[in-house]
């Protein structure tokens, strides 16, 4: 009878434990939730994610991990992942710095300094992970033939701390990059406004010159200049609408517009000079002929005056 009661009690307790285990589902690790928040798909973040996944695998300290830790396989893999991450991060940072050109120098310098410090912290964290694994390999090789259980426990504890610090610094870097990107977007918008303000007077000046000189050179030239001015204004409006996303393209188009304005102004000046030369060639012969006729008339008048002034001979002797 006691055996039966004992069997029933064990069965009851086992059923209760099974219900408790089914009711409590494991929640994802806080680190995994935080990692998912800052990974937005940028190339440097994807590279850092590969480094992170490899570090999680190393932290399991499985038999395969322990075998590869005794060689240089793990450190070589980590080095390659570190280099890839820093390369992608540097490229992304350079891209943002190019977009920050219209921003004030003081603001750009401050953002660059903060981002550089955050990037250095992340690189130092990754370097600490690699250095700790190299140290572990040396310690294990020194204790060859002895128990390394204590070394593995210390390594596991240290790797957990390094992972937390790495995740914290990666999150900080991602936030600073977001601020950096917001500054670049704001600078691009300011740059568009500044470009429009600078080009507006140039376009208007070109239109006025075309109207003034074209009235001398002829009506067709004026019509061509006005049509070109209309096309230029339409082109500038089209460029202004797309500048926010393609600031580099706007810079190239600005240079092209300025070159066209200078070329058109030069052509107008040359046409005005040619017109002036034609006018001069028309009137110079007429002026010279008038001068010759005037000189001949003066000579005739002088001759006539001289003849009338001569003395008349007397008849008395």
UniProtKB/Swiss-Prot annotation:
The keyword Transmembrane helix does not apply. The modification Methionine sulfoxide is found at residue 143. Sequence repeats lie at residues 80-101, 102-123, 124-145, 146-167, 168-189, 190-211, 212-233, 234-255. Heparin binds at residues 162-165, 229-236. Residues 210-290 are annotated as: Lipid-binding and lipoprotein association. One of its GO terms (cellular component) is intermediate-density lipoprotein particle. Residues 278-290 are annotated as: Specificity for association with VLDL. GO terms for biological process: acylglycerol homeostasis; cholesterol efflux; cholesterol metabolic process; chylomicron remnant clearance; high-density lipoprotein particle assembly; intermediate-density lipoprotein particle clearance; lipoprotein biosynthetic process; melanosome organization. Residues 1-18 form the signal peptide. Keywords: Chylomicron, Endosome, Extracellular matrix, Glycoprotein, HDL, Heparin-binding, Lipid transport, Lipid-binding, Oxidation, Phosphoprotein, Repeat, Secreted, Signal, Transport, VLDL. The modification Phosphoserine is found at residue 147. It is found in: Secreted; Secreted, Extracellular space; Secreted, Extracellular space, Extracellular matrix; Extracellular vesicle. APOE exists as multiple glycosylated and sialylated glycoforms within cells and in plasma. The extent of glycosylation and sialylation are tissue and context specific. Glycated in plasma VLDL. Belongs to the apolipoprotein A1/A4/E family. Homotetramer. May interact with ABCA1; functionally associated with ABCA1 in the biogenesis of HDLs. May interact with APP/A4 amyloid-beta peptide; the interaction is extremely stable in vitro but its physiological significance is unclear. May interact with MAPT. May interact with MAP2. In the cerebrospinal fluid, interacts with secreted SORL1. Interacts with PMEL; this allows the loading of PMEL luminal fragment on ILVs to induce fibril nucleation. APOE is an apolipoprotein, a protein associating with lipid particles, that mainly functions in lipoprotein-mediated lipid transport between organs via the plasma and interstitial fluids. APOE is a core component of plasma lipoproteins and is involved in their production, conversion and clearance. Apolipoproteins are amphipathic molecules that interact both with lipids of the lipoprotein particle core and the aqueous environment of the plasma. This is Apolipoprotein E. The gene is APOE.
